Amino acid sequence: MPAATVDLSQRICEVWACNLDDQMKRIRQVIRKYNYVAMDTEFPGVVARPIGEFRSNADYQYQLLRCNVDLLKIIQLGLTFVNEQGEYPPGTSTWQFNFKFNLTEDMYAQDSIELLTSSGIQFKKHEEEGIETQYFAELFMTSGVVLCEGVKWLSFHSGYDFGYLIKILTNSNLPEVELDFFEILRLFFPVIYDVKYLMKSCKNLKGGLQEVAEQLELKRIGPQHQAGSDSLLTGMAFFKMREMFFEDHIDDAKYCGHLYGLGSGSSYVQNGTGNAYEEEANKQS
């Protein structure tokens, strides 16, 4: 299979409250032929650490994720659609959903907001024209994109990304126990390939998404640290890696459903002493 490529005529569609319904109709059509969905989110950093005793480092990392996702709001979601051959839909391949976010009322980490602002995110527009998450969830649940075993999700170091999606889809805080989180995850997203987890089997690949893309000689489209561009690059990286390192076949038993840094696949540092939360919150994706 040729390496997955996207020419510059492919474009990212910006979605706000005013065009959400129309764009979700388009996605319902696209998902029928392009059933690989590369995903990324942007969120306002990490503002809290859990306190108390934890059964393991993995438990600490999940509780860190849970307390921050429960406290904070998603800012952007990027979805890129690809078919089995690594081909993108003609015209629009990527949708960037911009959610309601208010810098006066909502919690955030200052360094994360500064990074996102410098990347071109327009917080005033998010406040005035952003999508309500509850209405998005209603449309998303019936889109054919979630709850479908035929849809394959592609992500990069995505514990927080899926955490925010589960919070939106369930309209509730994340479960207290990590095993329950993974049960809900499998319900909504039965097939997931986390590119960062796949990298464990790819000799010499290292770093964040941008660094990996450069090693794979992929060209980014759109601004870094925006969810649409990052989801597009995630999809490109997956198909290039599948070709180069996996002979165009991913072993589901070994790789499907694992999120880098969570569960038995945890690659985080010692409990409470490292910068794992900073790596995830400020990941180059």
Curated annotation (Swiss-Prot):
Disulfide cross-links: none
Which reaction(s) does the protein catalyse, per the Swiss-Prot or TrEMBL entry?
A: Exonucleolytic cleavage of poly(A) to 5'-AMP
Report the GO terms under cellular component.
Answer: CCR4-NOT complex; cytoplasm; nucleus
The record's free-text note on cofactor binding: Binds 2 divalent metal cations per subunit with RNAase activity being higher in presence of Mn(2+) than of Mg(2+) or Co(2+).
Per UniProt, subcellular location reads as: Nucleus; Cytoplasm
Primary enzyme class: hydrolase
Q: Name one GO molecular function term.
A: metal ion binding
EC number in record = 3.1.13.4
Main subcellular location of this protein, as a coarse class: nucleus
Keyword list (alphabetical) reads:
Cytoplasm, Exonuclease, Hydrolase, Magnesium, Metal-binding, Nuclease, Nucleus, Repressor, RNA-binding, RNA-mediated gene silencing, Transcription, Transcription regulation, Translation regulation
Biological process terms in GO annotation: miRNA-mediated gene silencing by mRNA destabilization; negative regulation of cell population proliferation; positive regulation of cell population proliferation; positive regulation of nuclear-transcribed mRNA catabolic process, deadenylation-dependent decay; positive regulation of nuclear-transcribed mRNA poly(A) tail shortening; regulation of translation; regulatory ncRNA-mediated gene silencing
Positions of a divalent metal cation 1 binding: 40, 161, 278
Q: Where does a divalent metal cation 2 bind?
A: 40, 42, 230
Q: Which cofactor does it need?
A: Mn(2+); Mg(2+); Co(2+)
Q: Where is the signal peptide?
A: none
* Subunit-level organization: Component of the CCR4-NOT complex.
Entries under PANTHER family matching the protein: CCR4-NOT TRANSCRIPTION COMPLEX SUBUNIT
What the protein does?
A: Has 3'-5' poly(A) exoribonuclease activity for synthetic poly(A) RNA substrate. Catalytic component of the CCR4-NOT complex which is one of the major cellular mRNA deadenylases and is linked to various cellular processes including bulk mRNA degradation, miRNA-mediated repression, translational repression during translational initiation and general transcription regulation. During miRNA-mediated repression the complex also seems to act as translational repressor during translational initiation. Additional complex functions may be a consequence of its influence on mRNA expression.
- Family that this chain belongs to: Belongs to the CAF1 family.
This one is known as: CCR4-NOT transcription complex subunit 7
Please give the organism.
Xenopus tropicalis
